[in-house]
Swiss-Prot record:
Organism encoding this protein: Phoenix reclinata
NCBIfam families per record: PRK04208.1
Protein name in UniProt: Ribulose bisphosphate carboxylase large chain
Positions that bind substrate: N123, T173, K177, R295, H327, S379
Residues that coordinate or bind Mg(2+): K201, D203, E204
Cofactor mode of binding and number, as noted: Binds 1 Mg(2+) ion per subunit.
């Protein structure tokens, strides 16, 4: 036990308040392979030294409280306390620092994202000594990640189930998201799938409302995808949203989907909660269902640059909790997403091993070992003119989801789906032939539109759209 980190319990109990940094700021600490490491962006209140602010975060998210308590002497704080082991100034920002905190593995319940977040971010964000606090990244040690099942199936198993290789998968969110009857909803699904899409999708807020109860929607969508499969010879799917007000109701909906023989269900993992999500992911693996994850509510948590939590942390948490797809921004389109940062967390979702790279916002090297990967889903204000950029940015292991970019086609849903499928196949072929999608993308789409009237019509409709 190193002298600078040892907590003296043998000298007798002394009541009162002492500076956190005396116990929790340990710049000489060498991190262990089993530690969970966190990088916090800390903005202290005026007059609060950064060392005290970083130590306060370590204390309040592990063993500490606001005053010395006599029961500290009944345990080994040196074994269980979080430690702020390094602080660096954020370049270009006034009074802002990155505080690195190491947490001993024994602080966390095995296989529980819920417990991990309750400990690390559950209480400390309202701390008075801090003006703002943001969790930028976590390093999940192998010894902890191996206690999680992770995604129900992963990328390779999904491709094998669908028998689709060598290209991104194509999807579409059914619009209008609310108000359609179940039969009309199923008709929209059928038109999109027969036109060439791989998936259609319930919107995140489609659950079981008076205008369309969940069982009716499930039945009509199952009929639609079976009919489209028979016509096209391709395996099709519709993300049936199983999110519900209780875990029991959610599981009932997932069981119904399994009985209908559909390949995939869906969950809103932030509004539904990590406990519910992990339960559903376990059910999906045991019963051969793929699991699509929507990140509704994420911007409430991750959009502010100096407070909250970066989406890369939510992405890592989802991979641990379980999901085969997750929405990950687009870089292009209507929703915010910076290219390098987006690609950083896309790699954290898909790859087995990701090197530390601060230029992409990756603060720690992450080794997922054997945990399956998650397909990133690009959606939000995208259309056929974005296809070359999306194909280049996201690569084959992704889902490109065009809602309005399919259903807004002037000739209807099926021609909209045809336009997207033709554009995608043209981009993949051009890439495989060695053409530069970033430089020649528009020309590739124009060439393809010469032999696809559906694509030509789509190009005309969205030629002036700028997000």
């Amino acid at each position: 036990m190193s002298p600078q980190t040892e907590t003296k319990a043998s000298v007798g109990f002394k009541a009162g308040v002492k500076d956190y940094k005396l116990t929790y700021y340990t710049p000489d600490y060498e991190t262990k392979d089993t530690d969970i490491l966190a990088a916090f962006r800390v903005t202290p209140q005026p007059g609060v030294p950064p060392e005290e602010a970083g130590a306060a975060v370590a204390a309040e998210s592990s063993t500490g409280t606001w005053t010395t308590v006599w029961t500290d002497g009944l345990t080994s704080l040196d074994r269980y306390k979080g430690r702020c082991y390094h602080i660096e100034t954020v370049v270009g920002e006034e009074n802002q620092y990155i505080a690195y905190v190491a947490y001993p593995l024994d602080l966390f319940e095995e296989g529980s994202v819920t417990n991990m977040f309750t400990s690390i971010v559950g209480n400390v964000f309202g701390f008075k000594a801090l003006r703002a606090l943001r969790l930028e990244d976590l390093r999940i040690p192998t010894s902890y990640s191996k206690t999680f099942q992770g995604p129900p199936h992963g990328i390779q198993v999904e491709r094998d189930k669908l028998n689709k290789y060598g290209r991104p998968l194509l999807g579409c969110t059914i619009k209008p998201k609310l108000g359609l009857s179940a039969k009309n909803y199923g008709r929209a699904v059928y038109e999109c799938l027969r036109g060439g899409l791989d998936f259609t999708k319930d919107d995140e807020n489609v659950n079981s409302q008076p205008f369309m109860r969940w069982r009716d929607r499930f039945l009509f969508c199952a009929e639609a995808l079976y009919k489209a499969q028979a016509e096209t010879g391709e395996i099709k799917g519709h993300y049936l949203n199983a999110t519900a007000g209780t875990c029991e109701e959610m599981m009932k909906r997932a069981m119904c989907a399994r009985e209908l023989g559909v390949p995939i269900v869906m969950h809103d993992y932030l509004t539904g909660g990590f406990t519910a999500n992990t339960s559903l992911a376990h059910y999906c693996r045991d019963n051969g269902l793929l699991l699509h994850i929507h990140r509704a509510m994420h911007a409430v948590i991750d959009r502010q640059k100096n407070h909250g939590m970066h989406f890369r942390v939510l992405a890592k948490a989802l991979r641990m909790s379980g999901g085969d797809h997750i929405h990950a921004g687009t870089v292009v389109g209507k929703l915010e997403g910076e290219r390098e940062m987006t690609l950083g967390f896309v790699d954290l979702l898909r790859d087995d091993f990701i090197e530390k790279d601060r230029s992409r916002g990756i603060f720690f090297t992450q080794d997922w070992v054997s945990m399956p990967g998650v397909l990133p889903v690009a959606s939000g204000g995208i259309h056929v003119w974005h296809m070359p950029a999306l194909t280049e940015i996201f690569g084959d292991d992704s889902v490109l989801q065009f809602g309005g970019g399919t259903l807004g086609h002037p000739w209807g849903n099926a021609p909209g789906a045809v336009a997207n499928r033709v554009a995608l196949e043209a981009c993949v072929q051009a890439r495989n032939e060695g053409r530069d999608l970033a430089r020649e993308g528009n020309e590739i789409i124009r060439e393809a539109s010469k032999w696809s009237p559906e694509l030509a019509a789509a190009c005309e409709v969205w030629k002036a759209i700028k997000f």
